[in-house]
Amino acid sequence: MENRRIIFMGTPKIASVVLKTMLENDIHVGLVVTQPDKKKGRKQQLVYSEVKEVALEHDIPVFQPVKIKSDYQAILDFNPDLIVTCAYGQIVPKEVLDLPRYGCVNLHGSLLPKYRGGAPIQRAIWNGDKVSGMSLMKMAPKMDAGPVLAQKEIEILPEDNSTSLFDKMAICAGELLLSHFEEICSGKAVYVEQD
């Protein structure tokens, strides 16, 4: 596979599954960007994000800006060909979005434009939806408003809850990215504007 300079940005478990899927399929990630470590529990011990744990297991450098809007020099210095995000947790500035030659793509846990913004998986459960899904989109300065490359539906079963749907979405996200990865990196991806 061509040596591409790829950054992965994400924080929770769903994102760690996507990162693992990329690595297991020989997609070399050269830098991981994730939220800063947080203190948790009564002893206030520092806890790493699930994405950071995967990065460290694979000896991938990790960048953890407190506010990416003002602290993104490490990303500029890396000069990526592609940035892949999934549940990163901060709005990525335009200076970063404009940098990679293949763009910045995001995996979002709903069938956009439905449930733009935070907690899309939980909102599908709360609203009693029968179907949800994953969207692969090109990032834009406005949250979850960029054009969509592909979507994959997931049936929500009566016994599903947020945890089980997160697990389904994580697998779906990795599969969706893999099925369109070469299309993205060849510059042949056709994105469709959202309604």
Over which residues does each language-model region extend?
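One-carbon transfer enzymes
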Residues: 1-195
